[in-house]
Every structure is written in structure tokens, then in C-alpha cells.
């Protein structure tokens, strides 16, 4: 009872006086408000402004760098042609973006994202769309193992088959 803890050190510090009933640490937002939340360095893109990247002779680091440069220029729809199953394409996109990939990706494609809508016309290797926070990824063919591991939100769709451990550690 409260009488027995009055003499405790925690009681002297005021730890037993705050009423916690009916309180929560959760913050609730409605969907309309969440559309206006952006990262401080997010780009203002126009989905009607469209461009293409021919990835046939470009390394994956340079492809990702080029995506960011184009977003900085206001492009909201980017088409990547000839991805050649390269690894780690489209990772770390924390922005609204329509990303269309005409072909297949290797390992770790479209990982650690928050916001883009991605359509992949081919297949993806293992660990595609890991740690996705928001947005949508649609794979037209098959996906490897660990597809969508550790996603927290968003929509992840594979129209073909997926490998083992798909969706492991999901929190969304």
C-alpha cells in the first residue's frame, strides 16, 4: 500500500505521486497529416517530371548517386533501364519518388527506404526491400530469400514466388 512506501527513497524523490492511468507515450496521426511529414533534407519532386537512367555501364554506387541528383533537380519519376541484376540499387531513398526498374535487381535492392513507390519488371535477389518504413514495392516476377525482412510499414508485393525467411522480423 502507499502507506508502506512513504518512507522509501523513491517516495522522497516523488516517484509515486504522478498519476499514470489513462496516459500513453504513443502519438497518433491521421493519414492526411502523415502525407506532409518529410525528412529535413527531403527533395521537393514533381511526379510528372520524368527521366531515365541507362544503368548498363554504371556501377551501383553511381546509379544511387544519380537517383539522388535527379531528385534534387525535381524529378519525381525515374526509370532505370538495364539494371543488369546489380546489387544494392535504390537503397536509402527517404523521399517520395516513383522509381521504375525495367529489369532485374541483385541482392539488397530497394533497402532502407521511406516513401518511394517502386515497380520492378524483373526478379530480385535476396534481401530486397529490407527495413522499408513506408512506400510500395511491386516485383513482377520472383524474389529471393529474406524478401521484406524487418519492414516496419509500406506495401510489399511479389507477383511470383518468394524464397525462405520472407517477411522475417516484420514490425509494421
Region spans (language model):
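Charge-rich, low-hydrophobicity low-complexity segments
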Residues: 1-169
Amino acid at each position: 500500500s502507499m502507506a508502506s512506501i512513504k518512507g522509501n527513497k523513491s517516495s522522497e524523490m516523488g516517484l509515486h505521486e504522478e498519476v499514470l492511468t489513462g496516459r500513453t507515450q504513443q502519438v497518433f496521426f491521421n493519414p492526411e497529416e502523415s502525407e506532409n511529414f518529410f525528412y529535413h533534407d527531403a527533395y521537393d519532386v514533381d511526379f510528372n517530371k520524368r527521366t531515365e537512367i541507362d544503368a548498363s555501364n554504371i556501377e551501383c554506387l553511381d546509379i544511387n548517386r544519380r537517383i539522388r541528383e535527379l531528385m534534387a533537380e525535381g524529378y519525381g519519376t525515374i526509370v532505370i533501364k538495364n539494371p543488369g541484376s546489380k546489387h544494392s540499387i535504390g537503397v536509402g531513398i527517404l523521399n517520395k519518388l516513383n522509381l521504375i526498374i525495367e529489369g532485374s535487381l541483385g541482392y539488397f535492392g530497394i533497402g532502407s527506404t521511406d516513401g518511394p513507390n517502386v515497380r520492378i519488371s524483373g526478379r530480385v535477389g535476396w534481401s530486397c526491400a529490407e527495413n522499408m518504413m513506408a512506400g510500395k514495392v511491386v516485383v513482377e516476377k520472383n524474389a529471393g530469400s529474406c524478401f521484406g525482412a524487418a519492414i516496419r510499414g509500406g506495401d510489399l508485393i511479389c507477383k511470383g514466388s518468394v524464397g525462405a525467411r520472407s517477411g522475417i522480423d516484420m514490425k509494421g
